[in-house]
Swiss-Prot record:
Residues 1-227, 242-310 are annotated as: Disordered. GO terms for biological process: intracellular signal transduction; regulation of signal transduction. This is Uncharacterized protein C17A5.09c. Residues 1-11 have a biased composition (Basic residues). GO terms for molecular function: protein phosphatase inhibitor activity. It comes from Schizosaccharomyces pombe (strain 972 / ATCC 24843). Keywords: Phosphoprotein. Signal peptide: none annotated.
Amino acid sequence: MKVKSILKHSRMSSPSLETDSMESGQQQNMVSSTPSIDMNESDCSGTGTPSEERIRRLRWDEENLSKAEQQKSAKMKITEPKTPFQRFLLPDDEVPEINLDETDSKDDFTAGTLGDTLGTLPSTRVSKDSKDDNVSFSSDKKQFYVKKEPFPVPCTEPTTSGDRYTVRMKAPTPKYSTDNHLPSKKELFPRETKPQVEVVHARINNPDDHLRTHPSVNNLGKDSDHADKMYNEGVILGEDEAMEEEALSEAEENIPKKKPDFNELRKKHYFAMAKPLKRDELESSGTESDLERDNSDSGSASDVNMNENE
């Protein structure tokens, strides 16, 4: 009883609370009524229910995602086709039979079907006429073969064939090519290293070999002083060295001849240019002398006439 009386007393005493409660209730009714109005407006617009709109948007997103994935995959994929693999199997009749037993001869193995199917392998033999390994020099008088080696191979004993042998000098290999260049004496015979004599066998077909097997001063070249010096020092040259010395001596003899030839040509050219000048000078001097003679003759004639008149 006391509680009710308190409530009644509170209601009677506070009319403002009732008005506040009424206003709050009206606001709740307005808020609850607003979505219903929006829904009705959306229905009236004709776009459809919100569930259908959401479904339509989801489909649109899915389509965009699928297109983006297709573009990415197209850029990342390799467009080159793969190499086709064709598996080829021989029939049983054409399969070669390989015997693992040892064969007595090579002809038995190559005569079978395996040799026919595989065919002959390319020959890997190197021809003897190859220019890289051996260099052959052929002429009417001599034929011998020279191998490319850094230094000549020394022989312990002199090898003879038919009482014929050649003596070659042991010297460092020259750094020049004998095709387009004539070596000098300094290149052939350096002062630092003393050449040593060494016997090397060579195959020579020359009827005049007895002149070369026993070298003399006359066979070493035209330069007698150089030949005497080499002969006294005990240096014996073979055929190649003698030929090189002869070529050097000929080249040295031809070098000083070029200067007088040039001087002679220059003198001839000078005299050829000077002759017409001399002729002009002589002619001019001749005309002057003729004029002087004419004047002197005319003067003498006038003197004679004057004397006669007197």
